[in-house]
UniProtKB/Swiss-Prot annotation:
Keyword DNA-binding: yes
Protein's organism: Streptomyces coelicolor (strain ATCC BAA-471 / A3(2) / M145)
Annotated Basic residues bias: 162-172, 183-218
Gene3D superfamilies: IHF-like DNA-binding proteins
A molecular function GO annotation: DNA binding
Name used for this protein in its record: DNA-binding protein HU 2
Family: Belongs to the bacterial histone-like protein family. Long actinobacterial subfamily.
Cross-referenced SUPFAM superfamilies: IHF-like DNA-binding proteins
Superkingdom of source: Bacteria
GO BP annotation list: chromosome condensation
Compartmental location: Cytoplasm, Nucleoid
């Protein structure tokens, strides 16, 4: 049975072929969208549709026997319900004047709309947590870089200040030494002048002796 035959089979119950076609399209569209989003669609007495992730693996090419790597992928999967299995196996007989699939319990169709499965929710939360951790790490790296730059600037400034102070001290020491040398140089000629004056006293002494000698001769 294909889609057109399915529509023909339910057209009488839905009031016409167009209404049946619209109903089939609406059911299939809702089913496909839910499975693609990661939801599990369960129909009581019929089965469930769900999305299954297959990890990367190796397979054999049936024609050449060559080993081929198969990438990670997701596939839809249908699991038949127990009621459906019992009808197919023959353990239960199909009802003649009733619906083959067990009807949904009263009140089950008026509940809240289906939500995303827990697995999908966990994946989304994990992605958000990873993004937040990356942002935090980036901020920490920026802070460390800024701290390193600030420390380098302070160290360089301190080194420059120390160098300036040391240079100033050396300059002051040189100035003091030069002043001391100049003072010593100025004081030295005074000593020489004193030394020069000393012979004058000797000359006076000689003159006095000469005068005394002349007096004696007389």
């Amino acid at each position: 049975m294909n889609k057109a035959q399915l529509v023909e089979a339910i057209a009488d119950k839905l009031g016409g072929r167009q209404q049946a076609a619209d109903a089939v399209d609406a059911v299939l569209d809702a089913l496909v969208r839910a499975v693609v989003a990661g939801d599990r669609v369960s129909v009581t007495g019929f089965g469930s549709f769900e999305k299954v992730d297959r990890p990367a693996r190796y397979a054999r090419n049936p024609q050449t026997g060559e080993r081929v790597r198969v990438k990670k992928t997701s596939v839809p999967r249908f699991r038949a319900g127990q009621g459906f299995k019992d009808l197919v196996s023959g353990s239960k007989k199909l009802p003649k004047n009733d619906i083959a699939v067990k009807k949904a319990p009263k009140g089950s169709l008026s509940g809240p709309p289906p939500t995303i499965s827990k697995a999908a929710g966990k994946k989304a939360a994990a992605k958000k947590a990873t993004g937040a951790a990356k942002k935090t790490t980036g901020a920490a790296k920026k802070t460390s870089a800024a701290a390193k730059k600030t420390t380098a600037k302070k160290t360089t400034g301190a080194a420059k200040t120390t160098a300036k102070k040391t240079t100033a001290k050396k300059s002051a020491a040189k100035t003091t030494t030069a002043a001391a040398k100049k003072t010593a140089a100025k004081k030295a000629p005074a000593k020489k002048a004193t030394a020069k004056k000393a012979p004058a006293k000797k000359s006076t002494a000689r003159k006095t002796t000469a005068k005394k000698a002349t007096a004696r001769k007389k």
